[in-house]
From Swiss-Prot:
Protein's recorded name: Guanylate kinase
Protein function: Essential for recycling GMP and indirectly, cGMP.
Gene Ontology MF terms: ATP binding; guanylate kinase activity
Keywords: ATP-binding, Cytoplasm, Kinase, Nucleotide-binding, Transferase
Family statement drawn from the similarity comment of this UniProt entry: Belongs to the guanylate kinase family.
Catalyzed chemical reaction(s): GMP + ATP = GDP + ADP
E.C. number: 2.7.4.8
Keyword Cytoplasm: yes
Guanylate kinase-like domain boundaries: 3-185
Database matches in Pfam families: Guanylate_kin
Gene: gmk
Organism: Francisella tularensis subsp. tularensis (strain SCHU S4 / Schu 4)
Length: 190
């Protein structure tokens, strides 16, 4: 089986994690795909567990792995490092799964440069910036300053959406999930 690397990007609050979670619960999702766990230096949120959502590491640990050329992609986002290690991709490729990377546009560029046609990409858009702000506020996990910063970053991220193979506007979750699943089903057969 030829393993593909699927890049999934979106601004915070667009519904990327919710769509991925629902997709991975489907038969095609759970049988054929695995999400690469990224490293991060940010603090865990309530309910997050090390090596499930992220590998939570210190800045020193991240920078040491970085100095050893241990990442296929990395970026500093919201004052924290995020990166996907080569060891994590090797682990998932050995399982024979297609890999899903939840990464930003910078990581997507780095990954496409390495993997070329083996890397496929989808960008999830909110229906509007106003709706995105409402979703971020509804989460009730970030301060107003953090939400304002995320909104600034969202505009930057959205400006790179045209670099992706497929764009999905997440307005109605059920319809978006159906389109999301179809994208993965079609690309696993290509």
């Amino acid at each position: 089986m030829n393993n593909y690397i699927f890049i999934v990007s979106a601004p915070s609050g667009a519904g990327k994690s919710s769509l991925l979670k629902a997709f991975l619960a489907t038969d095609i999702g759970k049988d054929n795909y695995a999400v690469a766990i990224s490293h991060t230096t940010r603090e865990p949120r309530v309910g997050e567990i090390n090596s499930r959502e992220y590998y939570f590491v210190t800045v020193a640990e991240f920078e040491q792995l970085l100095s050893q050329d241990g990442f296929i992609e990395y970026a500093k986002v919201f004052k924290n490092y995020y990166g996907t290690s080569k060891a994590e991709l090797d682990r998932l490729l050995a399982l024979g799964k297609n890999i899903i990377l939840e990464i930003d546009w910078q990581g997507a560029q780095q990954t496409r440069a390495i993997y070329g046609d083996r890397a496929k990409s989808i960008f999830i858009l909110p229906p509007s910036l106003d709706e995105l702000r409402k979703r971020l506020e509804k989460r009730n996990t970030d301060s107003k300053e953090t939400i304002d910063y995320r909104m600034e970053q969202a505009q930057s991220e959205i400006s790179h959406a045209d670099e992706y193979d497929y764009l999905l506007v997440n307005d109605d979750f059920s319809q978006s999930l159906e389109q999301f699943c179809k994208y993965f089903e079609q690309n696993i057969q290509s």
